[in-house]
Amino acid sequence: SLSVAFESVIATYNTNVGCGDVVAINANTGTYKATRSAINSFNTVPISSNSAVGTLSRDRLELWRSDLVRTIEYGHVEAPQEADQQPHPDCALTSALTRMELLAITDLCPDSITDGVALRFMSTTPEDSRQPEIKQSIDLEPHSTLVSIGQTAAAVYTPTTPAGTARITSFNQQGKELNAATVPSSPLLDGTAPTHHEDRTGVTTPQIADLPHHMSWFDGQRLYLFEPENLLISHIFEGALGTGIAVGGQLLYPNREGIAVADWNTGKILRVIPVDRQGYDGPVSLNQAGHTIIEQRDDTYVALN
């Protein structure tokens, strides 16, 4: 897998003991910055923030600092050095997000009475990286999954009845419910989008992006903006194709016609910049390199001048 953090490209390679060989390459010079090698799961996805990078799989999670030294591991440990250091080694992880010193995960445990999911908050840097320090655990309904995280809170998506609806609920790290809203069901999370949210790893990887004054999440058809402190939904942009970027104090995000320019304070779309994608109608996400806007269309990157 590949991820970007600490001004480096982090590449994780599969070996005969899992995806445990990791190389950090300086993005500016192309030189090696750090390496690590350890036992890991075979099917992993990257997880990262401005403060940490790591891998997530169905059975374990790891985070590393900029020199690739591990700061925390959670879940199944192949050869534990000491007994009883992991609080839930037999649980299956379903999603995870991290920001600053906060790590939030959802997992499903075989002894769950309600067959539900648990949301767990913990520090990214416990005193012993082998022994996670869980701050709070919250029982959730089945199929709940993380969609956003702030410095002190996280938001989860839960399918509800009737069909076609869902609920997004935010909790702080003390376990208090902050906000809840009924929303349309997510095509990515209910499996009706072209690219389902779960790949061969079996974990959910939400499509998120940071903006100057909001966190954002793309649900497969809509772009959600969350307030950073309490993760209250401030705006929902229908017809989006993916996550957007901030340019000149405004939100730019992809839609069918091109790139929509929106006011993130009011939620009003100001104009749409036409883009000819030459028949491509799949997901699109925006990035920026200098003054150039980059569209990622599946595995293809297109520079727009």
Segments and roles (model prediction):
Residues 2-123, 127-129:
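Long, acidic/polar, low-complexity amphipathic helices and coiled-coil-like
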Residues 1, 9, 30, 68, ...:
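Generic low-polarity alpha-helical segments
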Residues 73-75, 79-226:
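Acidic, serine/threonine- and glycine-rich low-complexity intrinsically disordered segments
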Residues 17-24, 58-65, 108-122, 161-170, ...:
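Structural motif
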Residues 1, 26-38, 68-81, 129-138, ...:
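Aromatic (tryptophan-biased) beta-strands that constitute blades/sheets of beta-rich domains
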Residues 11-12, 55, 105, 154-158, ...:
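Residue position within the beta-strands of beta-propeller blades
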Residues 219-233, 246-305:
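C-terminal closing repeat unit and adjoining cap/tail of repeat-based domains
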Residues 1-7, 37-51, 81-96, 137-152, ...:
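Repeated scaffold domains used in trafficking and secretory/extracellular systems
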